[in-house]
Amino acid sequence: MRCKRVHRVGVLTAMLALLPLAGLVPSAWAQNPPPTPADKIQVSASTIEVMDSTQPQPVTLLSVTFRTSTPADLLIRFTGECALFTDVMSPDGNSKANVKVWVELDGVPVPVTSDPAQGGPDDGKVVFCNREVQLTSPDVIDLFLRTRESHAFQWGALNVGNQIHTLEVKAQLDVLVTGGGAAEAAVGKRVLIMEPVHLEHDAAF
């Protein structure tokens, strides 16, 4: 009986010693999860990205890192709120403003089409909102316009290799103001969805 008791205590002690180690494994994986093959990814944000004429550089709206297990094609969809603010003053004021959005895969812009017969490959930039206002009047007039609306677009990337990739959505304000006035833009709530697919062998974007 004495031997059996010692044996049971030894087993119980070993089990209790292993419990803290078992708890450490999920915690470590939670902090540094191993990259897994992407099935379908969605990222979103609600922070407002403001762009004005003093900021000529593009801004990054969303970013995600993923891994494809086998060579695949990607369908990339972006939806977001686009706002424009234009201020034009007489006697002869003009304001042009538009926001272009595009996606970059591993630092390279994804074209809308790569087919030379359709004008490709292009730079992948899409106009999400656009405005031109001209004011000509002998009277003193200050015209301020503020609008916001939602838009969406989809890109496609063919034959993406099986490795870790970074996908970014970027935007830039193009503005031209003459006379008195100003122009600004903002992107609000936005969603990026990326889905690996296998299209037909002769598929083209």
Where are these regions (language model features)?
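Bacterial N-terminal signal peptides
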Residues: 12-24
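Bacterial N-terminal signal peptides that target proteins for export
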Residues: 2-15
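Compositionally biased, low-complexity repeat tracts
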Residues: 6, 18-19, 120, 184
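Extracellular jelly-roll beta-sandwich "head" domains, especially the C-terminal globular C1q domain
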Residues: 26-205
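Low-complexity repetitive segments in secreted/extracellular proteins
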Residues: 2, 21-29
